[in-house]
């Protein structure tokens, strides 16, 4: 049912197999409103979406059991994968629905949905007592539904609830993770937080939930429809998303970009090359009648979301998902806050970061966030352990620490071996590593600016050099350090060493 094809961090490129086709993840499900849909499903497909989601409760309200007789694919005129939500959003907005859990489940079966959701109780942004009740009732309903859904041909989703109460999120996920008759999991109630750009709450909920969910099952994030959240949620293990944001924003004259949402009246230029933006100017869009403007803005918003999904997939394929997180963190203050939180999850994310992927393209490092890039931090930790083990084995001698520039010339490692001294290299982000490890990925594949590195990065390097010097001296080595004062990062590292418990380290300037 779910085939994982590629992994970086906890993000996956995968395939969800359904009765009406295959969904390649990460994937976005545009919400189709059966009451009011300014963009046709054909246009949705043309924008790159072979899957959509619609609300089963609203289908029932409009068509009753007639929709079940025709089937949801025929009602929508959509031949691809259709996911149906149960009406939980209406509970969140209006306090209830007229259908029972059993009726909602049976209705989705008869609709012929490919992916369906039980009638859960969304938490939203409520007090602790209400949140506890939403989790308890959702769990009760999830257990109750077993006799109705076990063995069913469609994929049933277990909704994880708890909102901003992360212990409740974990409890909900822990129970759901043990219910094997659910072949997909959904994390609910993020919309109220996403609307306020409280992305840090959403990613924390995802992180807490994923700890208890089976690795081999896809995970859906309900109500997430902005490109700013996609890379972080995917990096934590979310596979699919849905939202009506593309059309809701369009109705208000709002224009989605990868770095925020603009009102069309505030734009003089369109920073996009999609079919809509290539044909029209902001002024032309503003002068259109409301219906046509809404349709075109919605199409643009869909194209942006589609492009964002492709960008995330490519980053996974290249092993550069962390670098995409860094890039996104500089697009909005809310994502900068999320990035700070992502560094706390590094142990969990590191497990999915392949050691050799992206060797041809290398690793790009920029600043403080790059220190937590799993491919760099893992090499640094491994190198430190290797230095200590080799120093212990050799039991003394002469050691010299030499700088290694980004992307050194081929053969540079070998050219420095010999002379009766043990050669160790040092680099920003990677720390100190022996010549024997020079060439191991990514020591020769890292690229970073040689000027203007943040003080924290230089301080981190100085600290790692000082630690290495202490280890070597403790094993009977005499140590000196070479540097080139003309190279800014090297000169700054030597200066920083004066306050890093290695002020007495002999240094020799050696340029060229």
Curated annotation (Swiss-Prot):
SUPFAM superfamilies: tRNA-guanine transglycosylase (SSF51713). Its cofactor is Zn(2+). GO terms for cellular component: cytoplasm. The active site is at residue 85. It comes from the Archaea. Zn(2+) binds at residues 272, 274, 277. GO terms for molecular function: pentosyltransferase activity; zinc ion binding. Its EC number is 2.4.2.48. The keyword Cell division does not apply. One of its GO terms (biological process) is tRNA wobble guanine modification. Substrate binds at residue 120. Pathway: tRNA modification; archaeosine-tRNA biosynthesis. The keyword Glycosyltransferase applies. Binds 1 zinc ion per subunit. Keywords: Glycosyltransferase, Metal-binding, Transferase, tRNA processing, Zinc. InterPro entries: ArchSynthase1/Queuine_TRR (IPR050076), TGT-like_sf (IPR036511), TgtA (IPR004804), tRNA_ribo_trans-like (IPR002616). Pfam families: TGT (PF01702). It catalyses: guanosine(15) in tRNA + 7-cyano-7-deazaguanine = 7-cyano-7-carbaguanosine(15) in tRNA + guanine. Gene3D superfamilies: Queuine tRNA-ribosyltransferase-like. Exchanges the guanine residue with 7-cyano-7-deazaguanine (preQ0) at position 15 in the dihydrouridine loop (D-loop) of archaeal tRNAs. Belongs to the archaeosine tRNA-ribosyltransferase family. PANTHER family: QUEUINE TRNA-RIBOSYLTRANSFERASE. This is tRNA-guanine(15) transglycosylase. It comes from Aeropyrum pernix (strain ATCC 700893 / DSM 11879 / JCM 9820 / NBRC 100138 / K1).
